[in-house]
Each structure stands twice: as C-alpha cells, then as structure tokens.
Amino acid sequence: MESCPSVKNILLLDSEGKRVAVKYYTDDWPTLSAKLAFEKSVFVKTQKATAGAEAEIVMFDGHIVVYKFIQDLHFFVTGGEEENELILASVLQGFTDAVDIILRNNVDKRTALENLDLILLCLDEIVDGGIVLETEGSVIAEKVSAHGIEGATSLAEQTIVQALTTAREHLTKSLLM
C-alpha cells in the first residue's frame, strides 16, 4: 500500500546546535529531552560535513536526515527509513528557498529570529501533521506573505521596494565617491 510522503520533523538549528525553529510531526521523540537529544546527535553527526548549496543525506538512528547549511543556520528534514530521499530533499529545498525569499536573501540567525513568526508559518505551509503539502519555495513564501502580518505589502511589492532601495543606495555611494 502506497502512502503519502511524510516527514517526522523539520529542524532549524544555529551553528552551535541550538534551536531556532523546530516542528515534530510524530511521537518518535515523546519528551522534550528526547527531542533535544536527537537534535544534538544530528547536529554533532553532521557538524563536520561540508554541506553547502546542495542537500546532503545521512542515515541516522533508523531515520533518513536530509540537511543543508546556509551561513550560520543548519536546516534538517527527517523522514522514516522507508521514505523517499528525493521527496525529503525537495521539502528541504522548498523550506530553504522560502526562508531565503522571506528573509530577502539575508539568511542568518539574527534575521531568522527577528522573523521567527514567518519561518514558523513556512513550516505550517510545507507540512501538516507530517504530510507534505507544498515543496515550491516561491509558493510557500507567497502563502506566508498573504496571511502573515496584516496590512503588510505583498511579496512582489516588497521585492520592488527592496530593488528601489538597493538602487538608491548604490547611486548614493557612487555619487559620494
């Protein structure tokens, strides 16, 4: 019997292995101490890896963990050992792409903590109860911006404003030099 693609957890840890944003979708880790122990173990196992722009995959404690590092943030998606690695990798890619869009290409711990509500909304848009809903980063980011902060401008408008601000900064710098 085929089942829907599922995820056991999504973790966003800092460069020291501390929580930034985490969501667990199964009872594989029933207590907070079990969750923290799993996070520490995964972090230690992957810490020496050179995960860069591409996702890395590791079997860990009967689970498949797909991970990626961006600056001082470590992104992890965990699935069961029977889960398709490509699906887990696409969930990870969708999450990192959405975070990149929402944080306007400034993906670091400080910015992530300042926008933690939006990152948690991303997790809600990607997975519900362990079932994968969406893996396209731009779609996730647009949904988050649509029901994020009331009265906020749309993501497209934010991008235009950001481009104009950047152009103005470059023009000012060139005029002052």
UniProtKB/Swiss-Prot annotation:
Cross-referenced InterPro entries: AP_mu_sigma_su, Coatomer_zeta, Longin-like_dom_sf
Compartments, as annotated in UniProt: Cytoplasm; Golgi apparatus membrane; Cytoplasmic vesicle, COPI-coated vesicle membrane
GO cellular component, one term: Golgi membrane
Biological process terms in GO annotation: intra-Golgi vesicle-mediated transport; intracellular protein transport; retrograde vesicle-mediated transport, Golgi to endoplasmic reticulum
Membrane topology note: Peripheral membrane protein
A Pfam short name: Clat_adaptor_s
Chief place where the protein resides: cytoplasm
Superkingdom as given in the UniProt entry: Eukaryota
Record keywords: Cytoplasm, Cytoplasmic vesicle, ER-Golgi transport, Golgi apparatus, Membrane, Protein transport, Transport
Oligomer and partners: Oligomeric complex that consists of at least the alpha, beta, beta', gamma, delta, epsilon and zeta subunits.
Function: The coatomer is a cytosolic protein complex that binds to dilysine motifs and reversibly associates with Golgi non-clathrin-coated vesicles, which further mediate biosynthetic protein transport from the ER, via the Golgi up to the trans Golgi network. Coatomer complex is required for budding from Golgi membranes, and is essential for the retrograde Golgi-to-ER transport of dilysine-tagged proteins. The zeta subunit may be involved in regulating the coat assembly and, hence, the rate of biosynthetic protein transport due to its association-dissociation properties with the coatomer complex.
Recorded family membership: Belongs to the adaptor complexes small subunit family.
Record's protein name: Coatomer subunit zeta-1
Originating species: Oryza sativa subsp. japonica
